[in-house]
């Protein structure tokens, strides 16, 4: 479990939420959960979050709804997590997994045994009962015995029970080459990525252009809500969603927002 933050940040600070996330990221680095490159990735994401106004755009909400419908329709959905995801949204990952089939797979670009075990500990310390009762399964550490075709890096190592046989994979904060490789395997890929121009965003089936800790609670909300819908309704939500159009609309949204910013707001 992540320990108490080293820096006391007053809740009145205008950057409170952002600073708290930075503290979590730094702590995850100290605990061996995060690779140093994860700090850079987080900073890059913050930049794009500023551009969208640090709130969930209506365009992103449409992607979240489509993602929720696709996850419910899936026969074997898997949530893929890396160090950044565990640092920022471990609670939400587990909550969503429990609404689905419980499968969470650890998949690291900078894969070391030490990082794998650190992430495994983070789940075991906080969700021991859920693991022991089978409500969630943490895959990809001791059972990463399959390889994604045409992906030579260690990132291609996956669990047969998890990503290798999944039909839908939720990949928060994913790399473009891996997202593309998963799509080429015939899988539906749901990405959470603040950069609408990234390869991940462009290659995925559904891209949620939003900050992880805002998007995940909304995704959980709509998964719970959409379970009451029939299959035909869910299929229509997915079929009506156009990822390329959604990304274009998001880029237009950012451009329009920047154009309309007043000097006072700047």
From Swiss-Prot:
The keyword Ligase applies. Catalyzes the condensation of (R)-4-phosphopantoate and beta-alanine to 4'-phosphopantothenate in the CoA biosynthesis pathway. Its EC number is 6.3.2.36. Homodimer. One of its GO terms (molecular function) is acid-amino acid ligase activity. Keywords: ATP-binding, Coenzyme A biosynthesis, Ligase, Nucleotide-binding. This is 4-phosphopantoate--beta-alanine ligase. It comes from the Archaea. Belongs to the archaeal phosphopantothenate synthetase family. It is an enzyme of class 6 (ligase). ATP binds at residues 22, 44, 193-195, 199-200.
């Amino acid at each position: 479990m992540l320990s108490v933050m080293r820096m006391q940040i007053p809740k009145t600070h205008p950057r409170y939420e952002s600073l708290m996330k930075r503290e979590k990221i730094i702590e995850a680095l100290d605990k061996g959960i995060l690779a140093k490159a994860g700090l850079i990735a987080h900073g890059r994401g913050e930049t794009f979050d500023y551009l969208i106004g640090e709130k969930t755009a209506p365009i992103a909400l449409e992607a979240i709804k489509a993602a929720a419908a696709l996850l419910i329709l899936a026969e074997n959905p898997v949530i893929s997590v890396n160090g950044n995801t565990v640092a920022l949204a471990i609670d939400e990952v587990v909550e969503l997994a429990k609404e689905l089939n419980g499968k969470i797979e650890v998949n690291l670009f900078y894969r070391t045994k030490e990082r794998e075990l650190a992430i495994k500990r983070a789940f075991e310390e906080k969700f021991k009962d859920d693991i022991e009762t089978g409500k969630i399964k943490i895959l990809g550490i001791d059972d990463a015995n399959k390889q994604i075709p045409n992906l030579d890096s260690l990132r291609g190592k996956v669990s047969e029970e998890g990503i290798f046989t999944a039909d839908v994979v939720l990949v928060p904060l994913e790399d473009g080459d891996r997202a593309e490789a998963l799509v080429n395997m015939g899988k539906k890929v749901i990405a959470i990525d603040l950069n609408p121009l990234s390869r991940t965003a462009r290659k995925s089936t559904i891209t949620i252009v939003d900050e992880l800790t805002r998007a995940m609670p909304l995704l959980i909300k709509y998964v719970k809500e959409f379970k009451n819908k029939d299959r035909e309704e869910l299929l229509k939500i997915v079929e009506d969603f156009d990822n390329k159009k959604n990304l274009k609309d998001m880029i237009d949204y950012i451009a329009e927002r920047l154009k309309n910013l007043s000097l006072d707001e700047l």
